[in-house]
């Protein structure tokens, strides 16, 4: 058991059609009445929705300073900080995972609260207290700020590229292997394990499995289910105080691919494929079910569908344990041999 466990949770979650119009009201309800709002966004998102959002905020007396980011990196975040025109009262992350991850990091550096306004369901960073940024020393993610609120507009999300929205499905299903890794680390290494946070993360994954038919067409009902599952996953991380309930060996595999692949796929696509293989290593029959659901929902289940060479899959499996050596998973401390990695990828159908 930990000597001390601190939980920081968001104060408000608003999900529905047209909820972007409620953003000024939500910000005011959280105690920010007027002043400057820093909006961190992406160029495509801002070109489509920026004028409307700026108008909504200015109408309610807020001064808006917006900045666009093109990649989730410490360098990009530092550019935002260096280019500030004033001292914002609150930061808004308005976009996909890149913009929101940078916004959370910037908010942490400024000592300000951050409101998450996701425009796609690409991964569970929309509600988590962690940011995955390039240029970090050590782990690929850093504890930043838990969003004080999440405002998810299904109308906006439905207009995101289908591939981006589908990617979040893979990130939610990854909880099946992540929680198993966490439990394994608890049993073998004495690491803290929070059963409540683990149960919440698993519930998100089970929810997506149960309602997968609604997700196939990415209907508004399906998108709402996916958004709520991603938010629940973020809450699980808040409760755990770490990314453990949401990120395990499947994420290490994905991060390894990011390092070595010539053209990595989307994060959620890669962890989905990783989940298939890691569940097999855990001896869980669930790997076949996850593979079937990913196939049914038009998500990659093979190296070819990821657009990654077979050799890169094998290499990623052999180096994944080195990405975060302090995070014990089914890959063990020594990782997989090349022979074991190739056998795993072939057995699960990831490579031919």
From Swiss-Prot:
Annotated pathway: Membrane lipid metabolism; glycerophospholipid metabolism
Enzyme class: oxidoreductase
Keywords from the named record: Cytoplasm, Lipid biosynthesis, Lipid metabolism, Metal-binding, NAD, NADP, Oxidoreductase, Phospholipid biosynthesis, Phospholipid metabolism, Zinc
Cofactor(s), by name: Zn(2+)
Catalytic reaction(s) noted: sn-glycerol 1-phosphate + NAD(+) = dihydroxyacetone phosphate + NADH + H(+); sn-glycerol 1-phosphate + NADP(+) = dihydroxyacetone phosphate + NADPH + H(+)
Chain sites annotated for binding NAD(+): 97-101, 119-122, 128
Domain of life: Archaea
Localization in the cell: Cytoplasm
Its EC number(s): 1.1.1.261
UniProt cofactor note: Binds 1 zinc ion per subunit.
SUPFAM superfamilies listed in its UniProt record: Dehydroquinate synthase-like
Main location: cytoplasm
Entries under Gene3D superfamilies matching the protein: 3.40.50.1970, Dehydroquinate synthase-like - alpha domain
Binding site for Zn(2+): 171, 251, 267
List of residues binding substrate: 124, 171, 255
Gene Ontology cellular-component terms listed: cytoplasm
Biological process, per Gene Ontology: glycerophospholipid metabolic process; phospholipid biosynthetic process
Binding partners and assembly: Homodimer.
HAMAP family for the chain: G1P_dehydrogenase_A
Family statement drawn from the similarity comment of this UniProt entry: Belongs to the glycerol-1-phosphate dehydrogenase family.
Functional summary from the UniProt entry: Catalyzes the NAD(P)H-dependent reduction of dihydroxyacetonephosphate (DHAP or glycerone phosphate) to glycerol 1-phosphate (G1P). The G1P thus generated is used as the glycerophosphate backbone of phospholipids in the cellular membranes of Archaea.
Name of the molecule in the record: Glycerol-1-phosphate dehydrogenase [NAD(P)+]
